[in-house]
């Protein structure tokens, strides 16, 4: 007799073994909701980190400018006369929100125009007779870098053009009785005493603020887009 071939019986796949693993609609919606909650919590934190980084960068720039002003005084014996008058009996606040003052500040400290061209004879005589470079301004120090020109204005890293520069022009190592354009309430808390007779020990102060509507940008930003930045020398 011939041998019989025996084949194993095939077992039909169960419905459960053919089903692919996956998420139900409820599980997907739950995951999306969790991601949304996490994103809502993270975005403000990320925004805060970025703002603090810009604040730090702005403070570094202001500190460099203040050091440049100190070197200017060491070189010439006085602070740059960037305003309409120069008083030696009181301390002096200069508003770089004024385009003319802003321009004189740049030319006095850099020894040139914003674009790098040479100072006129009149500017050298009035602002920096040796055309010495006390600080090198970069394009990121000015507003609207895409349209950079000799008329461009310095701003802080938030685009605030209302930069206040204060000199101890009475040479008593204290800045006092300052009347800020935005009022005393606009001052960062650490600078409050400079608006009083008690004063603040300093020779140079540079600051911007987000208080008292004492801020301005060429693109019309609001208070939440600015920050308090200052440097004391």
Could you describe each region identified by the protein language model?
Residues 12, 23-29, 67, 149:
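Generic hydrophobic-segment detector
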Residues 1-23:
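N-terminal leader/signal peptides at the extreme start of proteins
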Residues 5-6, 21-22, 52, 126, ...:
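Small/flexible residues
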Residues 55-233:
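N-terminal pilin/flagellin-like segments and related low-complexity appendage regions
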Residues 19-49, 54, 58:
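N-terminal single-pass transmembrane signal-anchor helix
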